[in-house]
Amino acid sequence: DAMLRIAPMPHASILVIAAGLIWLCIWRSTPRLAGIPVMALGVALALLARPPDVLVSSDARLIAIRSGATVFLVTQHKPDRFTLEQWAPVWGEVPLTPAQCTENTCRLGPVLFAAAPPADCTAAVLVSPAELTGCAGLPVIDRLYVYRNGATAAWVKGAKVTLRTDRAAQGSRPWVVPYPQL
């Protein structure tokens, strides 16, 4: 394979690198060298970017959970090849490892995967391919959540969970499935 996979860069990083490169190309004298530290800042911003801890597909059948340096893949069906190809660059060269779940639950770092309502709700975020209830105050990414909001990415930092959904990123466009009326 003659391809090197790298994690995607944040928009700010690309803009800073482009600004430094433009500065470097426009000027001819020594002030143009000021573009080099600006480009270095853009590269530093790219290196500081953190990939999501959880990715959930738009149908909640495919879930990837990052725990430390390992990315676990949780699925109850055959994984969708297209989705896996789209997710591959998110973590760079880190391979996806199938999660070994017992009794329909997995605790992978601060994330709890549950195929049925869990008895223990002590996690930063609860992820499930089924509809779940019963864990008050805990962010739940389940089948109903992704039905309403689309594919979801989650970043976990301590007890704080940041969610980013496909519907929030895409907005109301002709090609986006309309928000379901329940």
Question: Predicted segment positions?
Answer:
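Transmembrane helix-bundle segments that form internal channels/tunnels in multi-pass membrane proteins
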Residues: 1-68
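Membrane-interface segments at or immediately adjacent to transmembrane helices
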Residues: 48-113
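Short, flexible beta-strand-to-coil junctions
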Residues: 58, 77, 117, 129-132
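Helix N-terminus capping/helix-initiation residues
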Residues: 10-11, 80, 142
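Solvent-exposed soluble domains appended to multi-pass membrane proteins
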Residues: 119-182
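Glycine-centered flexibility motif
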Residues: 19-21, 42, 109, 150, ...
